[in-house]
């Protein structure tokens, strides 16, 4: 990517998301999504390679299809209601098409097919933006229009996403794909609680972004893209071992770490609304998600690969990349659960 064009591209990505998030008019919401999508394609291909080009094409085709469905849905809604406001979506078919388009943009099942492949084909920094920042605009639209959507549709999408995300990550050796399937699972949890308490969805999104950012920073610091490379961390950056373990367990939702907080709040909200079957299914399926993170920790922290090299450890000579945000983010990924009553009491 041209260094001169890089600030303009990132500014356009930021502006597109901001327009969509702050808009109450369907046309401007669509316009922001388009700006964001077109500006994000150069971000995916900033390190030119056949794999990143393929990933960018897959991303463009999927997002363009979702945008066409979204535009058709808002025109259909305007034709029947005469309204352009996002909070006034009275036609059920329009609502269904909008949710379908947003689910495709979020990478929720059964429209998840592009997320692992695109994440695998791009650099770590681009993958981080894809799995965090690019979720903000679709979630903001869904947040505004959730009263117009059938709860059963959202629950079906959510449970299916949790199932696909948890099951799909079991057989992976590439860390990019594992984090992509984890993203699908987290999207399912966020959308599931949206009809009951949208504020918990926002809390879940903030915690998810914090955990995912911490994980990507650790992987970038360690230059790890596969489980095999991650297993050599003890020889490269010994001090990073406890950080990897706590972050991955928190991302899997193990108590008493921060990642358990949104799941706890969501299950409690379902119980308040006398819905016990859905959270039970979601919690049981999420154990698969926790399992493949526990497997990563076992390979990384507990097993010790045989080494025939008797020289000094590599970490004694290697210069560590600067990561000023990592200590703060690591604390947030592990220690927010004790103050959960304070967090949940915020209106």
Swiss-Prot record:
Its main location: mitochondrion. It is a multi-pass membrane protein. GO terms for cellular component: mitochondrial inner membrane. The chain crosses the membrane at residues 13-33, 55-75, 96-116, 122-142, 151-171, 178-198, 199-219, 237-257, 277-297, 326-346. One of its GO terms (biological process) is mitochondrial electron transport, NADH to ubiquinone. The keyword Transferase does not apply. Its EC number is 7.1.1.2. It catalyses: a ubiquinone + NADH + 5 H(+)(in) = a ubiquinol + NAD(+) + 4 H(+)(out). InterPro entries: Complex_I_Subunit_2 (IPR050175), NADH_DH_su2_C (IPR010933), NADH_UbQ_OxRdtase_chain2 (IPR003917), ND/Mrp_TM (IPR001750). It is found in: Mitochondrion inner membrane. The keyword Electron transport applies. It comes from the Eukaryota. It is an enzyme of class 7 (translocase). One of its GO terms (molecular function) is NADH dehydrogenase (ubiquinone) activity. Keywords: Electron transport, Membrane, Mitochondrion, Mitochondrion inner membrane, NAD, Respiratory chain, Translocase, Transmembrane, Transmembrane helix, Transport, Ubiquinone. Core subunit of respiratory chain NADH dehydrogenase (Complex I) which is composed of 45 different subunits. Interacts with TMEM242. Belongs to the complex I subunit 2 family. Core subunit of the mitochondrial membrane respiratory chain NADH dehydrogenase (Complex I) which catalyzes electron transfer from NADH through the respiratory chain, using ubiquinone as an electron acceptor. Essential for the catalytic activity and assembly of complex I. This is NADH-ubiquinone oxidoreductase chain 2.
């Amino acid at each position: 990517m041209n260094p001169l064009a890089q600030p303009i591209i990132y500014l356009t990505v930021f502006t597109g998301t901001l327009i969509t998030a702050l808009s109450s008019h369907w046309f401007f919401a669509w316009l922001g999504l388009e700006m964001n999508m077109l500006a994000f394609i150069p971000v995916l291909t900033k390190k030119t390679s056949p794999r990143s080009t393929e990933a960018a094409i897959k991303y463009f085709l999927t997002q363009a299809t979702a945008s066409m469905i979204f535009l058709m849905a808002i025109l259909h809604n305007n034709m029947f209601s005469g309204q352009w406001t996002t909070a006034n979506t009275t036609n059920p078919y329009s609502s269904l098409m909008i949710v379908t388009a947003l689910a495709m943009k979020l990478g929720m099942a059964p429209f998840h097919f592009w997320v692992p492949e695109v994440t695998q084909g791009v650099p770590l920094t681009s993958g981080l933006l894809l799995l965090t920042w690019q979720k903000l605009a679709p979630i903001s639209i869904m947040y505004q229009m959730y009263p117009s959507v059938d709860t059963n549709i959202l629950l079906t999408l959510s449970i299916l996403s949790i199932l696909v995300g948890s099951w799909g990550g079991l057989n992976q050796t590439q860390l990019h794909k594992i984090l992509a399937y984890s993203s699908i699972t987290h999207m399912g949890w966020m959308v599931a609680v949206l009809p009951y308490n949208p504020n918990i969805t926002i809390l879940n999104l903030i915690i998810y972004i914090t955990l995912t950012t911490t994980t990507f920073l650790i992987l970038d610091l360690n230059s790890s893209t596969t489980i095999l490379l991650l297993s050599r961390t003890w020889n490269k950056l010994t001090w990073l071992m406890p950080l990897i373990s706590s972050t991955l367990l928190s991302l899997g939702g193990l108590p008493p770490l921060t990642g358990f907080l949104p799941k706890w709040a969501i299950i409690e909200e379902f119980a308040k609304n006398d819905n016990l079957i859905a959270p039970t299914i979601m919690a049981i399926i999420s154990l698969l998600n926790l399992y493949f993170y526990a497997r990563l920790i076992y390979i990384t922290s507990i097993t010790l690969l045989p080494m025939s090299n008797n020289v000094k450890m590599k970490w004694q000579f290697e210069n560590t990349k600067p990561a000023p945000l990592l200590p703060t983010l690591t604390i947030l990924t592990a220690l927010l659960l004790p103050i959960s009553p304070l967090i949940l009491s915020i209106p």
